[in-house]
A protein has these predicted regions:
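An N-terminal assembly and electron-transfer interface module characteristic of large anaerobic redox
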Residues: 1-196
Length: 196
């Protein structure tokens, strides 16, 4: 146990699309792994809109969905700007420091229940962009690499063997598609399934 986080006060939340991908099975594997690791008291709840795991104890409400979407927008923006600036920055680490600064700022704002409305986001997005634009860079031609694939493998350094770090060490500009595209894909598929 940690001083910061008690396993008795911890729960895991996993998203499930309800589609045919293997990620829909991860919740069962997580539960088995927690029991095997000695943490049977930690519940694993499912976040989905397709009716899976109806008794998971977690219900998505409209206000919570709005907050989650705002966080995805902010996260996508920070990742995109960081990846556009970092390969060209004059001072190594400046883009990562800017990400950390904005994660801290946004964390305080969001925890205070602000920053979720369209008006607040429209105010904040240009401020974030302005801060990244102020980082001194030297634009030189670089190979641009787009990373696609399964969500976990694409975004997790553990799952992709630190692919972004490797590509950047090879003097590449790395681009990950935003998570919002996946959210839109899931929403569209749900709509299509309903029509069918």
């Amino acid at each position: 146990s940690s001083d910061v986080c008690s396993s008795d006060l911890t729960a895991l939340l996993i998203t499930q699309t309800g589609g045919g991908c293997r990620a829909s099975n991860y919740i069962h594997l997580l539960r088995k792994a927690l029991v095997k690791a000695g943490y049977p008291q930690i519940p694993v709840a499912s976040l989905n809109f397709s009716g899976l795991e109806k008794d998971s104890g977690f219900q998505m409400t409209l206000p919570l969905a709005r907050r989650a979407l705002a966080c995805i927008f902010y996260g996508d923006m920070l990742c995109a700007l960081r990846n556009q600036v970092a390969p060209y920055e004059n001072e190594k680490g400046a883009a990562d420091k800017m990400v950390d600064l904005w994660v801290e700022r946004l964390g305080r704002v969001l925890l205070a229940g602000k920053g979720y409305t369209s008006k607040e986001m429209k105010h904040t997005f240009p401020l974030i962009a302005k801060d990244f634009a102020a980082i001194p860079v030297t634009r030189v031609p670089k190979v641009k690499v787009g990373v696609v694939g399964e969500i976990y493998v694409k975004y997790s350094p553990l799952g992709n063997n630190d692919l972004q770090k490797f590509l950047e060490s090879q003097d590449c500009e790395v681009n990950f598609p935003g998570l919002m595209g996946f959210v839109q894909y899931c929403a569209f598929n749900m709509g299509e399934d309903h029509v069918l």
